[in-house]
């Protein structure tokens, strides 16, 4: 299973989540619309991992997307990969702070991974959308980081703290419901 991510260190988190969700739901696919797992936000059963662990591609040159490789091996074994909009994970957008050459090498991993798996194909090239977004996000990321630093905000810490407050509030709003879960 996999789902969208929210970039906790970028502004407009809601818009970013919606955009990420759209890209992953509609283009992050292979072999007739089979879901590709996203490494920062994926879960697989132990039995599925044991079935493919001896077959996943070793990548000593570090030129492939390991999560897509895992996805394609799972599909080879007939496992179903699913996408859940509710399975949201927070990650950093620091990749947007790299040079274009570094970003390009990272995007080449899509092509390299599928080249290593000639039995698989994709209708959409997700990296094309990411290339289109890169200049804007690359420009925005350091500006937003300066804003956060000037206000002494650690976005990951803030999200964690906000989640803790929500948990406490839900306990006091519905103490019997929380106690039933514990």
Model-derived features with residue positions:
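A structural signal for short, well-ordered beta-strand segments and their strand-loop junctions
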Residues: 1-2, 82-84
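Short, flexible, basic/aromatic active-site loop/helix in glycosyltransferases
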Residues: 2-7, 13-35
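Conserved nucleotide-sugar donor-binding
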Residues: 37-53
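A residue-level structural signature of the nucleotidyltransferase/glycosyltransferase Rossmann-like core
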Residues: 41, 63, 81-82
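Acidic donor-binding loop at a coil-to-helix junction in glycosyltransferase catalytic cores
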Residues: 60-70
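Hydrophobic residues within well-ordered alpha-helices
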Residues: 73-75
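Active-site donor/metal-binding and catalytic loop motifs
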Residues: 84-101
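Terminal low-complexity segments of carbohydrate-biosynthetic enzymes
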Residues: 112-182
């Amino acid at each position: 299973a996999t789902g969208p991510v929210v970039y906790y260190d970028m502004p407009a988190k809601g818009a970013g989540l919606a955009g990420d969700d759209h890209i992953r739901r509609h283009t992050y696919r292979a072999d007739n619309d089979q879901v590709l797992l996203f490494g920062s936000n994926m879960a697989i059963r132990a039995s599925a991992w044991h079935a493919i662990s001896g077959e996943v591609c070793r990548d000593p040159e570090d030129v492939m997307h390991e999560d897509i490789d895992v996805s394609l091996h799972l599909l080879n074994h007939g496992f179903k990969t699913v996408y859940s909009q509710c399975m949201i994970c927070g990650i950093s957008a620091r990749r947007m702070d790299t040079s274009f050459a570094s970003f390009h090498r990272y995007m080449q991993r899509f092509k390299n991974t599928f080249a290593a798996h000639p039995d698989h194909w994709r209708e959409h090239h997700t990296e094309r959308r990411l290339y289109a977004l890169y200049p804007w996000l690359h420009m925005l990321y350091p500006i937003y980081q300066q804003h956060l630093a000037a206000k002494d905000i650690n976005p990951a810490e803030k999200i964690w703290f906000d989640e803790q407050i929500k948990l406490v509030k839900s306990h006091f709003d519905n103490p019997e419901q929380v106690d039933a879960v514990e």
